[in-house]
């Protein structure tokens, strides 16, 4: 009898969580007073098209695979350890984009980020030509083998553990370059460096 009561109580406390898209009405359940949308560890698979977030957007540890077209984040984006693999052109993020441990393989042209971009521990393979980062750029422990020619980084560059062994002909790093043990065999003929190189 005691087992049956324990089984009934246990079944009543178990919640059935299934992955689903996030709609405009459910968003209200995850917004705080500052306009931050907090979805960390939530069972959502997608975000609505044209979503505008007044504050920060946190999709860490979610099954969301792509950001919606027309997304505007007036704060920062936190997508660490999520299934995020695609960021469409036209996405605007006023703050930083921290995507450590996500599934990003390429970064398209036309994505605007106002701060650092952290792509550490992602399967990143390519960055667009003329890529500009308004803060630091980290590609630590990625399979990325080359940086695009003409890349401009307003902060520091971190490449330790990546596949990068050569630098493009022209590049600008206004902060420091942290090699993290990588050996660079080809250096730019035109390098604008604001700081130092740390091996």
Positions of predicted regions on the chain:
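Canonical leucine-rich repeat
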Residues: 45-47, 65-67, 85-87, 107, ...
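Leucine-rich solenoid repeat scaffolds
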Residues: 158-199
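N-terminal capping/linker segments that flank leucine-rich repeat
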Residues: 2-57, 191-194, 199
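Mid-chain, structured segments of secreted extracytoplasmic proteins
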Residues: 57-103
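Residues marking helix boundaries in flexible regions
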Residues: 5-10, 15, 94, 105, ...
């Amino acid at each position: 009898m005691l087992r049956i009561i324990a089984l009934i109580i246990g079944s009543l406390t178990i919640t059935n969580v299934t992955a689903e898209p996030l709609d405009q009405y459910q968003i209200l359940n995850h917004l705080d007073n500052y306009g931050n949308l907090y979805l960390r560890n939530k069972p959502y698979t997608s975000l609505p098209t044209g979503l505008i977030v007044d504050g920060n957007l946190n999709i860490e540890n979610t099954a969301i695979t792509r950001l919606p077209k027309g997304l505007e984040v007036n704060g920062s984006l936190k997508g660490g350890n999520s299934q995020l693999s695609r960021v469409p052109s036209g996405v605007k993020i006023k703050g930083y984009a921290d995507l450590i441990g996500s599934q990003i393989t390429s970064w398209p042209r036309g994505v605007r980020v106002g701060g650092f971009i952290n792509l550490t521990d992602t399967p990143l393979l390519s960055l667009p030509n003329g890529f500009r980062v308004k803060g630091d750029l980290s590609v630590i422990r990625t399979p990325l083998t080359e940086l695009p020619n003409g890349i401009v980084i307003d902060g520091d560059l971190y490449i330790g553990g990546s596949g990068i062994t050569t630098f493009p002909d022209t590049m600008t790093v206004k902060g420091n370059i942290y090699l993290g043990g990588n050996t660079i065999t080809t250096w730019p003929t035109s390098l604008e460096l604001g700081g130092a190189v740390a091996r």
